[in-house]
């Protein structure tokens, strides 16, 4: 639990819990949603479980590892939830991290547009949710697992964007097995 969605954290293209929510309250809400979600749990391609529910007027999603540990949690919508801009803090002087963020943002959006009609509506909604909330590593990991496990046939354009997306991340990323093994993933799905 890194606190990237805490109020005022300011991470690029990331949703934040409402102002005034303490780290303790956020953690309690995430644990509560993980244990008692408001909708059926859904197993993701990378093995995590997606749990979602509303607490205190805020729609929250929590991803739980197969061992029961909370991997991440984030607000989706509700009173006081904000999403930070998808831009560099100082666009005139972008940092290396800003440039990586630009690549990740662009190739994520492009790839999801390309596969929109070829993935289920439920999967696409989850992928857009991860993109909206700023969970880019998780999105790359679960897309990698999806494409690897299902034999999803990428077109050359889709593969090019997917390869550029995966290569935009510094690895290893904690608990992102498929993203961390990107060479194998790319070899498996290469058209």
Placement of each model-derived feature along the sequence:
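Compact soluble domain cores
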Residues: 1-54
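Histidine (H) residue identity feature
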Residues: 5, 11, 71, 79, ...
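Short linear motifs in intrinsically disordered/low-complexity regions
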Residues: 6, 12, 37, 66, ...
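General structural signal for secondary-structure boundaries
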Residues: 22-23, 77, 120, 155
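Amphipathic, positively biased hydrophobic alpha-helical segments used for protein targeting
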Residues: 39-40, 68, 84, 145
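Active-site or metal-binding loop neighborhoods of secreted/extracellular toxin and effector enzymes
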Residues: 45-97
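C-terminal-biased regions
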Residues: 95-191
């Amino acid at each position: 639990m890194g606190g990237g969605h805490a109020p005022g954290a300011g991470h690029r293209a990331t949703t934040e819990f409402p102002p005034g929510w303490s780290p303790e309250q956020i953690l309690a809400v995430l644990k509560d949603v993980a244990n008692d979600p408001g909708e059926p749990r859904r197993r993701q391609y990378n093995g995590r479980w997606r749990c979602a529910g509303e607490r205190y007027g805020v729609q929250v999603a929590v991803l739980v590892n197969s061992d029961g540990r909370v991997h991440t949690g984030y607000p989706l919508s509700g009173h006081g939830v904000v999403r930070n801009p998808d831009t560099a803090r100082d666009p005139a002087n972008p940092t290396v991290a800003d440039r990586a963020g630009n690549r990740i943002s662009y190739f994520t959006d492009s790839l999801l547009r390309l596969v929109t009609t070829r993935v289920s509506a439920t999967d696409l909604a989850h992928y857009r949710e991860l993109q909206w909330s700023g969970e880019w590593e998780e999105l790359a990991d679960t897309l990698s697992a999806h494409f690897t496990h299902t034999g999803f046939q990428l077109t050359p354009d889709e593969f090019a964007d997917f390869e550029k997306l995966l290569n935009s991340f510094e690895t290893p990323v904690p608990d992102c097995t498929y993203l961390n093994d990107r060479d194998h993933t790319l070899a498996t799905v290469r058209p």
